[in-house]
């Protein structure tokens, strides 16, 4: 199953769960409002002697507070759904390196990172699995592409393995600059966009 299909399935599952949670929240909202109305009527009867105007004001205040509470519960339910969808996407992110197209994506991440750092002598840090996936000949070919883009002689060397789900971390040889193109970092950099798209899709 491709990444897009996986994401679509996750969002569809999350939407079904969203409908369930929102239905429960709506039912809770109705109960809160009904109880508030009953309480308001009761309180109204008790203070009628103080004047109808004061009674109506008290009733309105109680109902208003109940509506705010119900709205809060709905917002909490939506946030729970969004977090659930994000967590599922994170789980699928860990599985991305198992996809056949992953090597090409990894090569592009290395290339983009090297170009962003301006070429030169760079250290490519990968996890243990990807250290085997990216051989020296792949890095040699990338050196030429980076040189063409940056107009600077480029040398790419693999550094010590790093604990990431996938992707790469590129560092200058002097250690002064680095670019984190790990899958986790890319996900976090795009988290606001991801949240917005999930919200649009579900609600």
Swiss-Prot record:
The superkingdom of the source organism is Archaea
Q: Which InterPro entries match?
A: ATP_synth_B-like_membr_sf (IPR028987), ATPase_E_C (IPR038495), ATPase_V1_Esu (IPR002842)
Q: How does activity depend on temperature?
A: Optimum temperature is 80 degrees Celsius.
Please list the GO biological process terms of this entry: proton motive force-driven plasma membrane ATP synthesis
Name its cellular compartments.
Cell membrane
Protein's membrane topology: Peripheral membrane protein
Annotated Gene Ontology cellular components are: plasma membrane; proton-transporting two-sector ATPase complex, catalytic domain
Q: How does activity depend on pH?
A: Optimum pH is 6.0 for ATP hydrolysis.
Give GO terms: molecular function aspect only. ATP binding; proton-transporting ATP synthase activity, rotational mechanism; proton-transporting ATPase activity, rotational mechanism
Keyword terms: ATP synthesis, Cell membrane, Hydrogen ion transport, Ion transport, Membrane, Transport
The family classification in the record reads: Belongs to the V-ATPase E subunit family.
Q: Any domain commentary?
A: Purified ATP synthase is 25.9 nm long. The hydrophilic A1 domain is 9.4 X 11.5 nm, the central stalk is 8.0 X 3.9 nm and the membrane-bound A0 domain is 6.4 X 10.6 nm; the domains are connected by two stalks. ATP is synthesized or hydrolyzed by the A1 domain while ion translocation occurs via the A0 domain.
Quaternary structure (record): Might form a homodimer. Interacts with subunit H via residues 41-60. The A-type ATPase is composed of subunits A(3), B(3), C, D, E(1 or 2), F, H(2), I and K(x).
> What does the UniProt function comment say about this protein?
Component of the A-type ATP synthase that produces ATP from ADP in the presence of a proton gradient across the membrane.
Spell out the protein name for this chain.
A-type ATP synthase subunit E
The organism named in the record is Methanocaldococcus jannaschii (strain ATCC 43067 / DSM 2661 / JAL-1 / JCM 10045 / NBRC 100440) (Methanococcus jannaschii)
């Amino acid at each position: 199953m491709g990444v897009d299909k996986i994401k679509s399935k996750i969002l569809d599952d999350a939407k079904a769960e969203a409908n369930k949670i929102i239905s429960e929240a709506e039912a809770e909202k109705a109960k809160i409002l009904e109880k508030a109305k009953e309480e308001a009527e009761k309180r109204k009867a008790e203070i009628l002697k103080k004047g109808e105007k004061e009674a109506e004001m008290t009733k309105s205040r109680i109902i208003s507070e109940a509506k705010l509470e119900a709205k809060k519960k709905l917002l909490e339910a939506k946030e729970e759904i969004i977090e659930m969808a994000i967590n599922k996407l994170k789980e699928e992110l860990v599985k991305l390196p198992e996809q056949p197209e992953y090597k090409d994506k990894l090569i592009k991440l290395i290339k983009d990172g090297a170009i962003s750092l301006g070429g030169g002598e760079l250290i490519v840090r990968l996890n243990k699995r990807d250290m085997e996936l990216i051989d020296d000949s792949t890095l040699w070919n990338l050196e030429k592409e980076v040189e063409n883009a940056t107009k600077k002689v480029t040398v790419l060397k693999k550094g010590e393995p790093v604990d990431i789900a996938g992707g790469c971390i590129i560092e200058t040889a002097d250690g002064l600059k680095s670019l984190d193109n790990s899958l986790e970092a890319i996900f976090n950099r795009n988290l606001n966009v991801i949240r917005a798209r999930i919200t649009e899709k579900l609600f």
